[in-house]
C-alpha cells in the first residue's frame, strides 16, 4: 500500500530538515519543490503545488501558518468547496499513479494541520495510507528563529506583539496537530534529537510509522546535510517579551509533548494536552475580550483609511470624466459615416 507521509509542525521547527532527510533516505518528494531563498538556503523540500494550494486558500481567509485562534482550522474547513477538494484529489491521484505500490510520498507542509480532515479523506479515498511526522522545537527557539527570519526590520513594539502571538500560535498549532493525528500512525521528532543523532531519531520515527529507512550504518548523504549549526536559536526566554502566564503554559505544553516522542499513543500525554488546550482556549478568550476595544478601534481606523483612499480614487475619476467631456465638446459633433467617407447622401 502506498503511503503519504505528511511532515508538519510549527513554522521554523525543523520541518525542512526532516523532509530533506527523508528525501535522502530515498522517499519521494513531489516535484517541483518550493525554491530555496535567503530564509532557507538549504531547501524547503516542500511540494510547490501543495504550498500554493494551501497558501491561496488560507491566505484568503487570514489563516496564518501558525495561528493563535483555536478555531482557525474550522474557519478554513468551512470555506472548503467541492472544486477545491477536487483539485487536491486530482493532484494526489496523479502523484500516486506515478509511484510504485510500496512507495512513500513525502508531503511537507506546515499549514496542512489546519485542514487535516481533508487530507485524511482524500488520501483514504485514493487507496493510500496516511502517516504523519510532527517536528517539535522549543517555543523560545521557534520565536527567536521567526524573529531572525521575518521580523528583523520591524519596530520594537511590533516585534514584541509578534513574539507573544507566535508563542501562543506555537502552542495552538501543537494542540491542533496532536489532536488531528491521533487516528493514524504518527511520530514526533524533537529538532535537537534529529541534529544530534539523526540515525537514532530516524530509526525510532520510521519504526513508529512502519517505514524502512534502509541501511544507515555506512556514511550517508544525511551526514553532510544535517549539522548542529542548523540550530542557532537558544531555548531560553531571556530577552523575549512574553508574559509569564503564556511562558508557563508553553513550557507545560512542551513537556507533555516530549512524552509522545517515545510513545505517540501515550494516553497520559493526550489527556494533559487536552487540558492544556482548554486552558489555552480560555486564555485566548480572555485576551480577545481584553483587546475588544482596541480591535474595534483598529477596524474603524482601517475602515476610515479605506474610505479616504476610495474618496481620492473617486475624485480622480471625476476629474478624468470632466476632462473627457471637455475634449469631446472641443472636438465638436462626431462625423457620420457618409461625412467621414465623403460619399453623397
Regions found by a protein language model. Give the residues of each.
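Lumenal/extracellular "mature" regions of secretory-pathway glycan-modifying transferases
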Residues: 150-169
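Short, well-ordered alpha-helical microsegments
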Residues: 15, 113-117, 198
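Glycine-rich phosphate-binding loop used to anchor ATP phosphates in small-molecule kinases
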Residues: 84-118
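The conserved 3'-phosphoadenosine-5'-phosphosulfate
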Residues: 34-41, 134-139, 144, 182-252
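PAPS-dependent sulfotransferase catalytic core
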Residues: 1-88, 312-315, 319-325, 329
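PAPS-dependent sulfotransferases, especially Golgi type II membrane carbohydrate sulfotransferases
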Residues: 207, 211-345
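Conserved phosphate-donor/acceptor-positioning beta-strand/loop module used by diverse small-molecule
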Residues: 108-112, 126-148
Amino acid at each position: 500500500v502506498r503511503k503519504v507521509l505528511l511532515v508538519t509542525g510549527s513554522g521554523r521547527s525543523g520541518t525542512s530538515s526532516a523532509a530533506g532527510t527523508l528525501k535522502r533516505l530515498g522517499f519521494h518528494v513531489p516535484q517541483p519543490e518550493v525554491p530555496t531563498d535567503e530564509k532557507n538556503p538549504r531547501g524547503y523540500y516542500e511540494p510547490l503545488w501543495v504550498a500554493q494550494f494551501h497558501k491561496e486558500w488560507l491566505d484568503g481567509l487570514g489563516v496564518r501558518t501558525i495561528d493563535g485562534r483555536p478555531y482557525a482550522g474550522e474557519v478554513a474547513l468551512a470555506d472548503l468547496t467541492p472544486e477545491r477538494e477536487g483539485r487536491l484529489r486530482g493532484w494526489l491521484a496523479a502523484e500516486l499513479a506515478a509511484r510504485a505500490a510500496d512507495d512513500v510520498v513525502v508531503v511537507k507542509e506546515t499549514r496542512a494541520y489546519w485542514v487535516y480532515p481533508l487530507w485524511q479523506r482524500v488520501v483514504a479515498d485514493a487507496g493510500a495510507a496516511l502517516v504523519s511526522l510532527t517536528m517539535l522545537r522549543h517555543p523560545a527557539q521557534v520565536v527567536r528563529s521567526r524573529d531572525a527570519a521575518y521580523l528583523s526590520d520591524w519596530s520594537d513594539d511590533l516585534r514584541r506583539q509578534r513574539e507573544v502571538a507566535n508563542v501562543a500560535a506555537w502552542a495552538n498549532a501543537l494542540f491542533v496537530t496532536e489532536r488531528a493525528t491521533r487516528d493514524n500512525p504518527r511520530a514526533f521528532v524533537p529538532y535537537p534529537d534529529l541534529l544530534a543523532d539523526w540515525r537514532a531519531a530516524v530509526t525510532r520515527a520510521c519504526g513508529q510509522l512502519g517505514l524502512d529507512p534502509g541501511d544507515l550504518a555506512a556514511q550517508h548523504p544525511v551526514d553532510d546535510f544535517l549539522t548542529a549549526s542548523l540550530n542557532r536559536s537558544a531555548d531560553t526566554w531571556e530577552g523575549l517579551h512574553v508574559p509569564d502566564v503564556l511562558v508557563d503554559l508553553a513550557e507545560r505544553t512542551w513537556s507533555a509533548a516530549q512524552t509522545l516522542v517515545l510513545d505517540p499513543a501515550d494516553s497520559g500525554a493526550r489527556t494533559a494536552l487536552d487540558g492544556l488546550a482548554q486552558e489555552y482556549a480560555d486564555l485566548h478568550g480572555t485576551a480577545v475580550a481584553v483587546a475588544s476595544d482596541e480591535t474595534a478601534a483598529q477596524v474603524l481606523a482601517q475602515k476610515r483609511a479605506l474610505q479616504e483612499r476610495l474618496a481620492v480614487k473617486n475624485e480622480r475619476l471625476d476629474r478624468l470624466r470632466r476632462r473627457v467631456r471637455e475634449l469631446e465638446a472641443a472636438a465638436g459633433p462626431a462625423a457620420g459615416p457618409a461625412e467621414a467617407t465623403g460619399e453623397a447622401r
